[in-house]
Amino acid sequence: KSPPAATAAGAIALPSVTLGKPDSRKLKLGWIGCGGRGSGAINQALTADSNVQLWSIGEAFKDKADAGLERIQKIHPGKVSVDKSRVFAGLDAYQKVIDSGVDVVILTTPPGFRPMHIKAAVDAGKHVFAEKPMATDAPGVRSVIKSIAKAKAQGTSIVDGFVWRWTYAQRDTYKRILGGDIGTTDPDGYFG
């Protein structure tokens, strides 16, 4: 909806790329899923731009939500604006974060929930960073495809955590492999 929100959503995954002209309004981030990967993602999001603040968090378990908040407050004390009324726990915590006035949601819950969370965020008009994978089965993939189409139509962003394909070094390496610079490759010899 606003260029800064698109910038933050993109900066979460691609911090070196500016997707819009920033303004002075601080973007409110909602963090859903406070485990290890979630801690890394929210740390990266708060590091990516000076105009972002963590506004609310959601986690299935209250103790994990509290621990996540405590952990990130130590790393980014000036960028965490989460009061106790915006720390949500339970299986509906994702919806409470989405409804808390955030601009961008960071989805780092277990991937089986991701299609439902993406849909809810897009339906609410939020920008989304969703950790990979976005879905774990065919119905989930179809749901995410529909959410992506809706996000495009309404002008909101969905960015996923699979960012290596966008770095110049990775792209150059891939191009060289396809070009035969290292000889013939065996695709069965790689897992990752």
Each language-model region and where it sits:
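N-terminal glycine-/serine-/threonine-rich beta1-alpha1-beta2 phosphate-ribose binding loop
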Residues: S2-K126, R142-G155
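A contiguous active-site-proximal alpha/beta segment in oxidoreductase catalytic domains
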Residues: H127, M134-G192
